[in-house]
Design a protein with these regions (language model features):
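Secondary-structure capping and boundary motifs in well-ordered enzyme cores
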Residues: 46, 50-56, 67-71, 75, ...
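Secondary-structure transition/capping motifs at alpha-helix termini
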Residues: 81-89, 110-121, 141, 145-150, ...
């Protein structure tokens, strides 16, 4: 009878299953972490170490998390866990942005616009707060499911009364430092939001508008001066403007020309016209009209000229402006100070009054016949008809261009002057200080510096006021007659903030001026709320200062690349305005998630990859591995097929660990008592290779090159382990005596390599790393969790065989294997053992 030798072999045995079953296993591990209070244990373990602070940019508390949220939170978690392994105390306090219009709209949708809940401001605020909190709970569950470890029970929320109070205090500091000003500067206005928008809330899309060329007739009294400028007697003449916003013509107050440009007097079927010399051919082609040149003059010589509004009985002043170019149009710029920044600035310079054709909601005032009550964006064709009837219209045609849209409603905006509160970029040197500060910040990728610098250089004053209910109040006390802020306002900020801390943001509505100031009859309370970008932008003051002290600057801000114009910028501006310094030492950005065709994910395209579905079907570790293995600095392609490929990559890593753990089933404290100098040389080699891998990964982690980290670890599992070492030691592991030196040497090496590898994968494959850690007593003896494991000291192993010698040995091995394969293919041998 043939003997069964199976029982004489040291066959692998492990509790680590081949099939991961992550969707079921991961929730069990989450429960385990919760039961041991893992986050707090990590804090206690690292309390005396140097801190590394990654400050969480707050997601908006509305709707389910999407793949972009997952990318952001997973990257942050990888950073935090990596820094913890490197010996830092790296706390993570997540946060949420909770005020603003989207929440208001959802509450209105739930209760109805005409409901008592919506009409009663106090009830409305309570409903908004309740809604935001419910959204936070939903998002929090999904973030935790991703394996993101943080102080979830003490997260910061911009709706917390303490946060709202600190937001008011931060505004107080900014006002005290001289950065606030009131004005009627033109700002982007959204009809759907019924409010002004900040630059960060504006998107640009292609739009077809009506472009018009309009003649502004020179008043008779100015013809003599005009004739002198052109050295030609002129009895009648018009300056021609070009604009893509016909609806702004009723608000025209001036026409701007370039002082350094040349202008030509031409004759045409429309009469004598003046336009920039460089644009005559362009205008002639656009109008289908031959223009006969009569005379030329320099812009600076054309002065003290007054024009007639094309159809309204008022003057339009001709002014010189350096903003005028000859890129397109006529070189004569229609100037409506209520509807353009350049227009506003040039009219302010020449003391020209701003004309308000629109009311505070963007509708034409009653005195504008034919337009009264109309929204500006629907007035273009009517204005064109009026201009045509008046004989001032020269040309009208469609014009394709990039136009500002509301980022929430995807509807076109108007640029309109409304009374607002601004943080001035020039007053008290805020812009200059910000541009200087970004030079000292580490930007990753490096192009981030040029991007934010160019955005700062071109940005207008920051409009921080909103006409909403659900937001932190701007608690200013304003003189009824002069509009000036109360002289004691700087002191009042703290008193008002204390009330908000106790009662919530409703405290400002409840506040009676009698209780705040003596001269209360002369003052009123401001009713505006703060831009939500101010809320999130002041978190360094409201959160970090409280948690870690006023001198701390965050080591890292990590968000999507769109935040150069959003959170990075608002945080920078408030940081400079409050403390005179940037709130971060380094800024790291990631790209957007797209499909295989480079398109953003959207339900309408059917290309959405749901993080919840990935967790339920494949497991969060697969999602985490995809994030880590993708170069996140660029656009990140996510499809079901790519995730399947990532799952295959995961299986190779897992099976490598499973083989190692299977052969360590009887490895214990006694087995570990082996002198490293006595190890078999190949065992020394694999430990040395793992130590080298550890060093390489550490350097890659320092530069956040996680895709290279994954590549290195995967290649090590496939090549050094799977392709060389594990294959070589199989016979030694299976057939030598269980307590033999040869087997103990291999087991010692396997344990050392596994101990190194498990730490390297733990920031990425958090659930799998914990599962492996819990599968062996020697790991569990080190710590309750892989995330509590002490820093491993890696000592170089002395070997009689050099790295170069090993290269020769492995080259010979490969050559022999190739010849064996050839012999097998040629049927010379049946197998390698022959």
């Amino acid at each position: 009878m043939e003997k069964d030798y199976k029982n004489t072999l040291n066959l692998p045995k492990t509790d680590l299953p081949m099939k991961a079953g992550l969707p079921n296993k991961e929730p069990e591990i989450l429960s385990f972490w919760d039961s041991i209070n893992l986050y707090n244990l990590i804090r206690e373990e690292n309390a005396k170490k140097d801190k590394f602070i990654l400050h969480d940019g707050p997601p908006y508390a509305n709707g389910d998390i999407h793949l972009g949220h997952s990318v952001n939170k997973i990257l942050k978690d990888i950073v935090i866990k990596t820094k913890t392994l490197q010996g830092f105390d790296a706390p993570y306090v997540p946060g949420w942005d909770c005020h603003g219009l989207p929440i208001e709209l959802n509450v209105e949708k739930k209760f109805g616009r005409d409901s008592d809940t919506v009409k009663d401001k106090s009830k409305f605020i309570s409903a908004c707060r309740e809604y935001a909190l419910s959204q936070i709970e939903n998002q929090k569950k999904d973030f935790i499911r991703l394996g993101v470890l943080g102080d979830w029970e003490n997260s910061y929320k911009s709706l917390d009364s303490s946060f709202e109070a600190d937001t008011v205090r931060s505004l107080g500091r900014i006002v005290t430092n001289g950065h606030l000003q009131k004005g009627e500067k033109p700002v982007h206005f959204c009809y759907d939001c019924k409010s002004a928008l900040a630059e960060a809330e504006v998107e640009y899309e292609d739009k077809v508008s009506k472009s018009i060329d309009v003649g502004f007739k020179v008043k008779k009294d100015s013809l003599i001066k005009l004739s002198a400028a052109f050295s030609k007697e002129i009895d009648s003449c018009s300056f021609v403007i070009w604009t893509t916003t016909p609806w702004t013509i009723p608000a025209n107050a001036a026409v701007s020309i370039g002082p350094e440009l040349k202008y030509t007097l031409c004759s045409s079927k429309f009469g004598n016209l003046i336009l920039a010399s460089d644009l005559i051919d362009q205008c002639s082609e656009r109008w289908g009209e031959d223009l006969e040149k009569i005379s030329e003059a320099k812009g600076s010589d054309i002065k003290d000229v007054v024009l007639e509004h094309p159809y309204l009985k008022r003057d339009s002043i001709l002014v010189h402006g350096d903003h005028v170019t000859t890129e397109t149009g006529t070189g004569c710029v229609h100037t409506a100070p209520a509807h353009g920044v350049d227009d506003h600035n040039i009219c302010k310079k020449f003391n020209i009054e701003t004309i308000h054709a629109l009311d505070g909601n963007g509708f034409f005032n009653a005195e504008y016949e034919g337009l009264a009550g109309l929204p500006a964006i629907k007035a273009d064709n009517i204005v064109i008809d009026i201009l045509n009837d008046s004989g001032a219209l020269i040309n009208a045609e469609d014009f394709h261009h990039s136009y500002p849209y509301c980022w929430r409603h995807k509807t076109p905006l108007i640029f309109a002057s409304t009374p607002q509160w601004f943080i001035s970029m020039d007053k008290s040197g805020l812009l200059e200080g910000s541009i200087q500060a970004v030079k000292d910040v580490e930007w990753e990728p490096s192009w981030g510096y040029e991007r934010i610098k160019s955005m700062l250089e071109g940005r207008p004053d920051w409009c921080i006021s909103r006409q909403r209910s659900w937001g932190v109040p701007i608690p200013l006390i304003i003189n009824k007659k002069t509009g000036e802020i109360h002289p004691k306002q700087n002191l009042l900020f703290n008193e008002i903030a204390d009330r908000i801390d106790e009662q919530g943001l409703e405290a400002w509505d409840k506040a009676n001026l009698k209780d705040l100031i003596d001269d209360h009859d002369e003052y009123i309370k401001a009713t505006d709320t703060l831009d939500v970008w101010f809320d999130s932008g002041s978190t360094h003051f409201c959160v970090l200062d409280k948690l870690y002290g006023k001198d701390l600057i965050a080591d890292l801000y990590l968000e999507g690349s769109d935040q150069h114009r959003g959170w990075f910028q608002s945080s920078l501006l408030t940081g400079i305005a409050i403390n005179g310094k940037a709130p971060y030492k380094a800024v790291l950005t990631h790209g957007f998630v797209v499909d295989e065709n480079g398109r953003k994910q959207s339900k309408s395209l059917g290309n959405v990859v749901s993080p919840q579905k990935v967790c339920n079907n494949l497991g969060a570790d697969i999602l985490r591995l995809w994030v880590a293995s993708t170069d996140f600095r660029s656009e990140m392609v996510a499809t079901d097929e790519i995730l399947k490929q990532v799952a295959d990559q995961y299986r190779r890593i897992r099976n490598t660990f499973r083989f190692m753990m299977g052969n360590l089933n009887d490895f214990n404290d006694d087995s570990k008592n082996i002198n490293q100098n006595d190890l078999v040389e190949i065992d020394k080699w694999i430990i040395s290779a793992a130590i080298k891998l550890d060093e390489e990964v550490k350097n890659l982690n320092d530069s956040y090159a996680y895709h290279h980290v994954v590549q290195k670890i995967h290649n090590f599992c496939v090549h050094e382990l799977g392709g060389i070492y594990l294959d070589i030691i199989k016979d030694r592991m299976y057939v030598t005596k269980s307590d033999s030196h040869a087997r103990n040497s291999a087991q010692f090496a396997l344990f050392e390599v596994a101990d190194i590898l498990i730490r390297l994968i733990s920031p990425i494959l958090v659930f799998t790393a914990e599962e492996i850690w819990q599968s062996h007593d020697l790991f569990k003896k080190q710590s309750k969790s892989v995330f509590l494991c002490p820093k491993k000291s890696l000592n170089k192993i002395e070997s009689s065989i050099s790295d170069d010698d090993w290269k020769v040995i492995f080259a010979v091995k490969d050559s022999v294997n190739q010849n064996i394969e050839k012999a097998r293919a040629d049927s010379v041998i049946k197998g390698s053992l022959d």
